Amino acid sequence: MILGLSIHGMLLHYYGRMIREYKNFLNISYFQEISNLVCGNEFAWFYNENISYKNSNNNINEHGFSHWIVHPNRPDGTTMYQDYFMPLLLMIKDCVKRNKIIRARVDMTMVATEKFVHDYHKDFEQENIAAILYINETDGETIILENETEKIIKPEVNKLVTFDGNISHTGCSPLKNKRRILINSNYE
């Protein structure tokens, strides 16, 4: 188990309604462990017909892969990699000053042949803070819709983005990179 890690991230941007970006959120050694795990050939990915939402519009680019770390219906844990991820989730929980991890999963979207914006969605209707930690070098942006204005967040390796989870948001499939990998989590 990895213990005793500290947050090294620096607050880069603060937008309205709690949209925040932290560059180099994790220390290099811990981030590299997580990156090697989820980008490696042995990590267990599970196929989703629509990575953003349960209902599918049958668009060929909606699909993706995920791996649950904390499932909302199984809060005691759902992965054999719990020891790798729990320190990270606890650090984010402290960063956003919340008491509970509602859910967390690793997500991967694949390269698209043309620009593809996934479905806008809210992870939960209840009050929560959403967090995204970017794992790999990629070009698939995150778009957060605030007051009908799109805030475009460019992915950077080891950058954490936190925001009000009641805001509609989405991601874009990469065009220049084979895949976009991130850890998405929510806290109340």
Q: Where in the sequence are the language-model features?
A:
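Short hydrophobic targeting helices and cationic amphipathic motifs
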Residues: 3-5
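Generic cytosolic/nucleocytoplasmic N-terminal low-complexity/intrinsically disordered segments
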Residues: 9, 57-58, 104, 158
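Non-heme Fe(II)/2-oxoglutarate
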Residues: 12-99
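Catalytic core of non-heme Fe(II) oxygenases with the double-stranded beta-helix
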Residues: 74-188
